[in-house]
Amino acid sequence: MLKIGIIGCGFIGGQICRAIDSGEIDAELYALCDSSESKAFGLAKSLNTCKPAYMKIEELISSVDLVVESASQNAVRFIVPQALKAGCSVMVLSVGALADKELRETLFGLAKKHNCKLYFPSGAVVGIDGINSAHAAGISSVTLTTRKPPSGLMGAPYVVEHGIELEKLEKETILFEGTASEAVKAFPANVNVAATISLAGIGFERTMVRVIADPSLSRNIHEINVEGEFGKFCTKVENLPSPENPKTSYLAALSAISTLKKILNPVQIGT
């Protein structure tokens, strides 16, 4: 049975743990790690059947078959290279870290050298399969428009640096327009989907992103427009925010669970 270690015990990490605990994912939840030991112990205690150990990063990496990173972009930079060098496959949720070209090339190179897998779930969007398919023929443009309630954008570096008073907004307001490379740095906890779209399609510099704050919304909305040799398509998803973290969409956790199930399933459906 596949041994899984989870680094990052927030909303998504917790949802994955509960999916394993319930038997939805047929794997062994072997270990947990978090910058807050109390959070990791609290999560472990809340489970019914699984009894994961709390481990430091190095011990966890050496003990499991698959590391699930659900912590932060900084965690990707620090942890994922270690895991790959140890011959351990990794599922990355803080995909925005890969906007760093040097890090991206390093991770891809290590995965190839050590015969490991890097998994990037679709996250809070739909249409990654279509982008993957369209890329084979050629894509001319990709645009992501993200709309969120102001509470879901609080604390973002771009908001802080520009002194944007989100709580005072009374109508839909465009906060940012730029490349995916710029977006994931400006909103590291909000637009990881921009990174996933970039990896599947035409890259971080050609993928365009628009971030909108809308006080009338109660959901996180992501719309993707793609054009190319194949024709064009548009996808739109209206996500319920996580009750624990309004910056995270519930669908992002479901996507991570689905990816783990796909890894374990001998039957593969879809692109």
Swiss-Prot record:
Name of a matching Pfam family = NAD_binding_3
Q: Which NCBIfam families match?
A: NAD_NadX, PRK13303.1-3, PRK13303.1-4, PRK13304.1
* Similarity remark: Belongs to the L-aspartate dehydrogenase family.
What role does it play?
A: Specifically catalyzes the NAD or NADP-dependent dehydrogenation of L-aspartate to iminoaspartate.
User: What is the protein name given in its UniProt record?
Assistant: L-aspartate dehydrogenase
> Which pathway does this polypeptide act in?
Cofactor biosynthesis; NAD(+) biosynthesis; iminoaspartate from L-aspartate (dehydrogenase route): step 1/1
Q: What is its EC number?
A: 1.4.1.21
**Extra facts:** The iminoaspartate product is unstable in aqueous solution and can decompose to oxaloacetate and ammonia.
